[in-house]
Every structure is written in C-alpha cells, then in structure tokens.
C-alpha cells in the first residue's frame, strides 16, 4: 500500500511513477496501527495533543468527530469524518514531516 501511495504522490507532483522507490527500499517501519476509541460519555476532553506526524504519511479512518487540523491562518478547525461516493467511511491521507 505504501509503495502505491508513493507512486500516486509522485504522479500528483508531476514526477515519474516510481520516483520515490529508491528512497523507500528499507523503511524503519512498515506499518504502525493506533486506535483511539470514541467515548460518547465524555465531552470536550482532549485526546492526543497538538502534533505533526513524523512519518511520510498517515492513513486515518475517522468515523467519529474530534479530529482537528491547523489551517494556514494558524487556527484549529474541525476535520469531520468523510465518506466516499458510495456513502461508506473513507480514508484520509495526511502528509507527514518526512514527505513534506
């Protein structure tokens, strides 16, 4: 999946497919899975604090509200869960520090 995403990023940037392949032949980690369960009984409790993702990219499947992003004006805004064309939960891909 990671290699396919790198190919898609390369094409989106106007680079040849496979451009990133020599740079990601031996990554330090293949996949790290983290689950932050939603607790409807808790209101307005901060989860993980403000941070950037250090990896190349992060795949998010957010099915509950709570995710926020810092916009260009340095204001935190909601990033509500998204759905695909079929109305199903969709993945969001955040660009991390290493790819930025």
Placement of each model-derived feature along the sequence:
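Peripheral, non-catalytic segments flanking oxidoreductase cores
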Residues: 1-100
């Amino acid at each position: 999946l990671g290699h396919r995403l790198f190919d898609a990023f390369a094409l989106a940037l106007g680079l040849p497919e496979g451009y990133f392949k020599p740079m990601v032949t031996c990554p330090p980690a293949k996949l790290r899975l983290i689950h932050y369960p939603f607790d409807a009984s808790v209101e307005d409790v901060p989860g993980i604090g403000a941070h950037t993702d250090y990896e190349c990219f992060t795949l998010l499947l957010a099915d509950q509200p709570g995710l926020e992003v810092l916009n260009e004006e340095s204001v935190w805004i909601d990033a509500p869960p998204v759905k695909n064309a079929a109305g199903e939960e969709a993945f969001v891909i955040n660009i991390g520090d290493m790819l930025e």
